Amino acid sequence: MALPDFSMRQLLEAGVHFGHQTHRWNPRMKPYIYGERSGIHIMDLSHTVPALHQSLVFVRDTVAKGGRVLFVGTKRQAQEPVAEAAQRCAQYYMNHRWLGGTLTNWSTVSNSIKQLRELNAMFESGGGSGLTKKELLDLQRRRDKLQKSLGGIADMGGLPAAIVVIDTNKEAIAVQEARKLGIPVVAVLDTNCNPSDADFGFPGNDDAARAISLYCNLFADAVLDGLAESTAGLGVDLGASADIASLADADVKLADEEAAGEA
């Protein structure tokens, strides 16, 4: 599987070049701005193309070495494409409110994930006999809340090797936690962003739904390319969803074994 390709035309059609209003900008993005039109900054896609390519290469290589990737996008227009992309390539995501400490306090988050798994297992097995209707309803609500917050990372099994971020301003806490832990940040950088927030950043619109979907799909394809490299010769068909799911399951099992060994 080849590294996902994209064209300047695709970027233009998705509106990647449109930035924010000129009064809403970060001066550090000046080198990546081509000009302005009707009070809107226009980004220079000649910078976007190589930077996006470099970001895709990094993600592919990270996965090929066995690393996990966490997609982060909690703004309304990013929620669905972020979840769909992560699920398609057997990776992980957070697309609702970022919980402070998700990365920097992973042990506590792991306990909440364990509780989510236990509740899922209980309801799937028809358990809960002996509980009152109110108790069952309370547990259902607890499970739903945990699923919404942590469902996308329930099988991650440990810290990611990289995070892919849509809107570094919106996801400032996630970016801060990743940088504190030395986890590389891959991110789209709109004209109101600080380019120093990303280790692998590329100039682009972080609000348009078409642009966000394009980024997410490209990174999902890069992950699949990395998985193909890491499983070369193992007889795994990445075209089969069951095989992709099995890779994720194996990743979680390995992480659990590593954690047990460290205990």
From Swiss-Prot:
One of its GO terms (molecular function) is structural constituent of ribosome. InterPro entries: Ribosomal_uS2 (IPR001865), Ribosomal_uS2_bac/mit/plastid (IPR005706), Ribosomal_uS2_CS (IPR018130), Ribosomal_uS2_flav_dom_sf (IPR023591). It comes from the Bacteria. CDD domains: RPS2. The keyword Ribosomal protein applies. GO terms for biological process: translation. One of its GO terms (cellular component) is cytosolic small ribosomal subunit. The keyword Manganese does not apply. Keywords: Ribonucleoprotein, Ribosomal protein. It holds the Pfam family Ribosomal_S2. Belongs to the universal ribosomal protein uS2 family. This is Small ribosomal subunit protein uS2. The lineage of its organism: Bacteria, Pseudomonadati, Pseudomonadota, Alphaproteobacteria, Hyphomonadales. The gene is rpsB.
